[in-house]
C-alpha cells in the first residue's frame, strides 16, 4: 500500500525482520540517538558501529588492536579436517549447535577470539559431520572483514 500510494510512512517497530522487509530507509537508535540511517541492505552489509552490527545481527565483532571489524556469520568457513588452500585458519571448539530448519547456527569458542557464531546451510552442515565438542579449523577472507567506527 505504501508504494502504491507513494506516501512517506514512519513505521516504528522493534521487529528487525519487519523493519528490514518494509523499509526503504531504516534508522537504528541507541539511547535515543540515531546511530545509523541507511537502506536495510546497507545496514546489514555495512554496519557503521559494533552496536549496529550486534543489533542488526548476523555479525561477529572482532577486535584487533584499537580497531574493530564486523564479520558476517555466513562468511566463516569451517573445516573439520584442518586448513585447506591458502587460508590461515583459527582453531576453535564447537560449543553449541542450533538447528534452524534449512540453516544451522554453530557457536564456536577460541581463547584468542572469544565466541563466534557461524551460520551455514543444513546441507553443508551434514556434509561436514560436525559435532559439539569437536575442534575445527575456521577461516574467512580478509575482504569479508568490515572496519567499524570507534563509537
Task: Name every feature range the model reports, one short phrase each.
Residues 68-151:
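Non-catalytic connector elements of ABC transporters
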Residues 30, 60, 87-88:
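Asparagine-centered polar/low-complexity signal
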Residues 45-66, 71-74:
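C-terminal boundary and immediately downstream tail of ABC-type ATPase nucleotide-binding domains
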Residues 39, 51, 91-95:
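Residues located in well-ordered beta-strands
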Residues 35, 41-45, 53, 77, ...:
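Nucleotide phosphate-binding site architecture
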Residues 1-48:
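ABC ATPase nucleotide-binding domains
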Amino acid at each position: 500500500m505504501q508504494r502504491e500510494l507513494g506516501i512517506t510512512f514512519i513505521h516504528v517497530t522493534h521487529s528487525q525482520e519487519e523493519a528490514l522487509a518494509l523499509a526503504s530507509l531504516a534508522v537504528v537508535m541507541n539511547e535515543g540517538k540515531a546511530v545509523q540511517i541507511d537502506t536495510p541492505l546497507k545496514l546489514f552489509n555495512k554496519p557503521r558501529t559494533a552496536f549496529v552490527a550486534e543489533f542488526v545481527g548476523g555479525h561477529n565483532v572482532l577486535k584487533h588492536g584499537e580497531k574493530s571489524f564486523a564479520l558476517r556469520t555466513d562468511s566463516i568457513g569451517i573445516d573439520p579436517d584442518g586448513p585447506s588452500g591458502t587460508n590461515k585458519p583459527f582453531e576453535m571448539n564447537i560449543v553449541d549447535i542450533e538447528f534452524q530448519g534449512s540453516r544451522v547456527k554453530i557457536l564456536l569458542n577460541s581463547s584468542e577470539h572469544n565466541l563466534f557464531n557461524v551460520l551455514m546451510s543444513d546441507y553443508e552442515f551434514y556434509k561436514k559431520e560436525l559435532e559439539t565438542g569437536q575442534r575445527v579449523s575456521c577461516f574467512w577472507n580478509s575482504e569479508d572483514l568490515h572496519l567499524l567506527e570507534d563509537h
